[in-house]
């Protein structure tokens, strides 16, 4: 079983974990191409491209200008990313065995790096997968990453010993690998969905759903889950599997108030 999630916009590079290895991202060469292209933008143009404030645009410009492939200013991405999903994962509660299992069974999709193993070292950056970066003959980042990212994820699924992909990424990021089950028909994609009962109906509450995705990552990694039936046993923070709302492709977990 392989799990995919989205990265976070929020980063914390103050913490250093020297006990864990730091590895090179698989698509470091491809990331370098993107960085070199983005260095051509001034902060104003970068802000328009990424729809960010002047302050954040200047920060991103500076980040791209000093980006490099050494580990001098890198952190393991699982440690560096923050936000609701990563709050739910709570990597600080993992033991060493959990961390190494996570490195084998989790991939973080990335606009800049394509796909990251948890121990992969990253520089501070922000580049969302949906950014409409057009250069050379590429229409956008989806076009840039194309089949090479899809085949990498298929390879990583196979490396876990089965054919299951658990999609805990947002659609913006999952879209970059959408269709891998058509390239390899043995791949089985399951998407957990988290809903809360409000005003007489079950609704997706965005912030809670994001944290729930992280909670499920934690549940899978700590319990070494490797099949759908055990996945359905997820029960953290009151969520329970709702068979009536689920189907073969979507596992719905609901929270009652």
Swiss-Prot record:
InterPro entries: YaaA (IPR005583). GO terms for biological process: response to hydroperoxide. GO terms for cellular component: cytosol. Belongs to the UPF0246 family. This is UPF0246 protein CLH_2088. It comes from Clostridium botulinum (strain Alaska E43 / Type E3).
């Amino acid at each position: 079983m392989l799990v995919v999630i989205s990265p976070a916009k929020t980063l914390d590079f103050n913490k250093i974990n020297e006990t864990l290895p730091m590895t090179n991202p698989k698509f470091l060469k491809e990331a370098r191409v993107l960085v070199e292209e983005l260095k051509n933008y001034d902060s104003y143009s970068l802000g328009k491209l990424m729809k960010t404030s002047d302050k954040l645009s200047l920060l991103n410009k500076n980040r791209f200008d000093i980006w490099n492939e050494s580990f001098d200013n890198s952190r393991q991405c699982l440690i560096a990313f923050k936000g609701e999903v990563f709050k739910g994962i709570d990597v600080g509660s993992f033991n060493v065995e959990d961390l190494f299992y996570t490195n084998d069974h989790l991939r973080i999709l990335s606009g800049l790096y394509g796909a990251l193993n948890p121990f992969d070292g990253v520089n501070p950056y922000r580049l969302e997968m949906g950014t409409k970066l057009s250069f050379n003959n590429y229409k956008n980042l989806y076009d840039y990453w194309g089949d090479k990212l899809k085949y990498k994820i298929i390879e990583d699924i196979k490396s876990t010993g089965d054919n299951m992909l658990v999609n805990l990424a947002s659609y913006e990021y999952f879209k970059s690998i959408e269709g891998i089950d058509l390239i390899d028909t043995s791949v089985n994609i399951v998407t957990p969905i988290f809903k809360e009962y409000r005003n007489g109906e079950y609704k997706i509450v965005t912030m809670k759903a994001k944290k729930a995705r992280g909670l499920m990552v934690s549940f899978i990694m700590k319990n070494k889950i490797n099949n759908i039936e055990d996945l359905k046993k997820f029960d953290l923070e009151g969520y329970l599997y709702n068979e009536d709302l689920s189907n073969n492709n979507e596992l719905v977990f609901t929270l009652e108030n």
